[in-house]
Regions:
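Hydrophobic beta-strand residues in large extracellular and virion-surface proteins
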Residues: 48-50, 60-62, 76, 83, ...
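Short solvent-exposed strand-capping/beta-turn motif centered on an Asx-Ser/Thr pair
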Residues: 50-55, 111
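Beta-strand elements of well-folded, non-transmembrane domains
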Residues: 52, 66, 122-126
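Intrinsically disordered, low-complexity Pro/Gly/Ser/Thr-rich segments with frequent PxxP/GP/PP motifs
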Residues: 70-103
Length: 127
């Protein structure tokens, strides 16, 4: 059985309206195959960096939950925190990382468009 693979996600902007950033859904297993795959994708988020590339402070919040979600209580990073001009904040997840199954979406909202850059290190595999 193959082991998990490590990937870098981003850089990409965090939108100024709730939008999906990361999800591990397999959209197609199309093709001819003699076996059925009884596995589901899983992502382990190890590290996230949010960088403000502007000359002024900008708020940002990341969430885990439904697609394009920003429900209270699902915040995982930022929680409306102002990221100082030309600065970054980081979050490291302990153990094997923040587990995200196929139904989980990492979403985000920034206080201004094209201001906050998202980057992450993840490990992806199948369960």
């Amino acid at each position: 059985m193959a082991s998990n693979r490590q990937f870098r996600v981003g850089p990409s902007y965090v939108a100024n309206a709730a939008a999906n950033i990361l999800n591990g859904t397999v959209t197609s297993l199309a093709g001819t195959t003699p076996v059925s795959l009884f596995v589901a994708p899983v992502i382990y988020v190890k590290h996230i960096t949010l960088t403000n590339k502007t000359a002024g402070g900008v708020t940002c919040t990341l969430y885990v939950g439904a697609t394009a979600g920003s429900a209270g209580g699902t915040e995982i990073m930022g929680q409306g925190q102002t990221i100082a001009a030309n600065s970054s904040i980081e979050k490291f997840f302990a153990g094997s990382g923040l587990r995200m199954d196929a139904v989980d979406f990492l979403t985000g909202v920034a206080g201004a468009a094209t201001s906050i850059v998202f980057e992450a290190e993840i490990e992806a595999g199948f369960q």
